Amino acid sequence: MSQEFAHLSVLLKETVDGLNIQPDGIYIDGTFGRGGHSRHVLSHLGPNGRLIAIDRDPQAIEAAKQFADDPRFQIVHGGFGQLADYVAELGLVGKIDGVLLDLGVSSPQLDDAERGFSFLRDGPLDMRMDNSQGQTAAQWIARAEIEDMAWVFKTYGEEKNSRHIARCIAADREKTPFLRTKDLADLIARITKNKERNKHPATRVFQAIRIYINSELEQIDQALEGAVNVLAPHGRMSIISFHSLEDRMVKRFMRRHSQGESVPHGLPITEAEINKSKKLKTLGKAMKPSEIEVEQNPRARSSVLRVAERLDY
């Protein structure tokens, strides 16, 4: 693997430590990427341990060949949103000792201009996590209504100028279709008046399109629900998020499953019944990378790790 596309796993020790790995346990790395977290998990497993990795990126599946000779490891080509389905097919529901999710786009995906994720590198406007299927960002931009684009930019990118940007994209695509990342990034930079300090004007729009194209938030929601339902009693989940939308989802999910389902005041429901709906115990506070890690890997700056443990059934 070239140095250009090398990937430094974020919060590596903290994330794997959060799983409290047992030598004979069964674990899931739902976001294999280039295998950094998987390698660390395998180093903690004994000969009877097992690691099931998942990724929908064909390049990640190719990278997984590095573990082809390790009988403890297997890779599944698919989205982590279907995690529970894969576990059910293997007959392992309720037997998983830990689930690891490193959300968002990986460094190799960002650094490879041909994947179309980066506004800093000119390449085809693609953005698909699985570039073997589904519509590209260019195809969506060519067809999307102004209102739909504005909604995506605001909802998934928290972009304040969403409507203005959507209108400008619609006007420009009538003359020339947006086929390259540079074309879209340059337009947004040109029409943005109040630029954020130390942030490219296209950051939020590119994030929004990527999340929408890949149904990322839906995948996260399905993965979290799936993980809590396949974990063994006292099994752990270590979840790394990189932006406020992701972290908000993870935080709310863990809070809901650790506090139990909320019920309207006055209903004749006992404390014991509420406790039955509690599935998780959150462990410690959210963790951020150290200053040293951020110096070594600036992309780790916004990462947040949350860990929870499955309660007894």
Curated annotation (Swiss-Prot):
Keywords: Cytoplasm, Methyltransferase, rRNA processing, S-adenosyl-L-methionine, Transferase. One of its GO terms (cellular component) is cytoplasm. The keyword Nucleotide-binding does not apply. Its EC number is 2.1.1.199. It catalyses: cytidine(1402) in 16S rRNA + S-adenosyl-L-methionine = N(4)-methylcytidine(1402) in 16S rRNA + S-adenosyl-L-homocysteine + H(+). SUPFAM superfamilies: Putative methyltransferase TM0872, insert domain (SSF81799), S-adenosyl-L-methionine-dependent methyltransferases (SSF53335). S-adenosyl-L-methionine binds at G35, G36, H37, D55, F80, D102, Q109. InterPro entries: RsmH (IPR002903), SAM-dep_MeTrfase_MraW_recog (IPR023397), SAM-dependent_MTases_sf (IPR029063). It is found in: Cytoplasm. The keyword Methyltransferase applies. GO terms for biological process: rRNA base methylation. Its main location: cytoplasm. GO terms for molecular function: rRNA (cytosine-N4-)-methyltransferase activity. Gene3D superfamilies: Putative methyltransferase TM0872, insert domain, Vaccinia Virus protein VP39. Belongs to the methyltransferase superfamily. RsmH family. Specifically methylates the N4 position of cytidine in position 1402 (C1402) of 16S rRNA. NCBIfam families: 16S rRNA (cytosine(1402)-N(4))-methyltransferase RsmH (TIGR00006). PANTHER family: 12S RRNA N4-METHYLCYTIDINE METHYLTRANSFERASE, S-ADENOSYL-METHYLTRANSFERASE MRAW. This is Ribosomal RNA small subunit methyltransferase H. It comes from Shewanella denitrificans (strain OS217 / ATCC BAA-1090 / DSM 15013). The lineage of its organism: Bacteria, Pseudomonadati, Pseudomonadota, Gammaproteobacteria, Alteromonadales.
